[in-house]
């Protein structure tokens, strides 16, 4: 997957989604074809996210360590790299130092 730098012709939710006392902030976007995504940033923290739909998390800047539900090993991801999370699952994410900027592709 190549690094997504911008989206054209989108609708943006102006109110941010704020999670974990502000450690993660994102905005939902809808593309012209109806595809939903979110763009956001995670500040230094270790957090656990639950998923409803399958997700592809694409790193835009910074780096993180990720552990998917049921796994014991952590994997490092940086800008231009992505990881897949199944529907109805969860993942732990650890960000240290620089914030981790991401695009979440749903479905």
Swiss-Prot record:
EC id: 2.4.2.1, 2.4.2.2
CDD domains cross-referenced by the UniProt entry: cupin_PpnP-like
Pfam family, one: Ppnp
One term of GO molecular function: uridine phosphorylase activity
Entry superkingdom: Bacteria
Keywords: Glycosyltransferase, Transferase
Cellular compartments per GO CC: cytosol
Gene3D superfamilies the record matches: Jelly Rolls (2.60.120.10)
Stretches of the chain forming a coiled coil according to its record: none
Catalytic activity: a purine D-ribonucleoside + phosphate = a purine nucleobase + alpha-D-ribose 1-phosphate; adenosine + phosphate = alpha-D-ribose 1-phosphate + adenine; cytidine + phosphate = cytosine + alpha-D-ribose 1-phosphate; guanosine + phosphate = alpha-D-ribose 1-phosphate + guanine
Family membership: Belongs to the nucleoside phosphorylase PpnP family.
HAMAP family: Nucleos_phosphorylase_PpnP (MF_01537)
Function (record text): Catalyzes the phosphorolysis of diverse nucleosides, yielding D-ribose 1-phosphate and the respective free bases. Can use uridine, adenosine, guanosine, cytidine, thymidine, inosine and xanthosine as substrates. Also catalyzes the reverse reactions.
Protein name in UniProt: Pyrimidine/purine nucleoside phosphorylase
Protein species of origin: Aromatoleum aromaticum (strain DSM 19018 / LMG 30748 / EbN1) (Azoarcus sp. (strain EbN1))
Lineage of the organism: Bacteria, Pseudomonadati, Pseudomonadota, Betaproteobacteria, Rhodocyclales
């Amino acid at each position: 997957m190549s690094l997504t730098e911008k989206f054209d012709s989108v609708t943006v939710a102006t109110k941010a989604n704020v999670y974990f006392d502000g450690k993660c902030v994102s905005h939902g976007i809808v593309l012209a074809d109806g595809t939903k995504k979110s763009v956001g940033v995670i500040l230094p923290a270790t957090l656990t996210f639950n998923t409803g739909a399958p997700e592809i998390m694409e790193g835009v800047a910074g780096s993180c360590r990720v552990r998917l539900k049921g796994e014991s090993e952590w994997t490092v991801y940086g800008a231009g790299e992505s990881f897949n999370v199944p529907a109805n699952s969860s993942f732990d994410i650890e960000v240290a130092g620089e914030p981790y900027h991401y695009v979440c592709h749903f479905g």
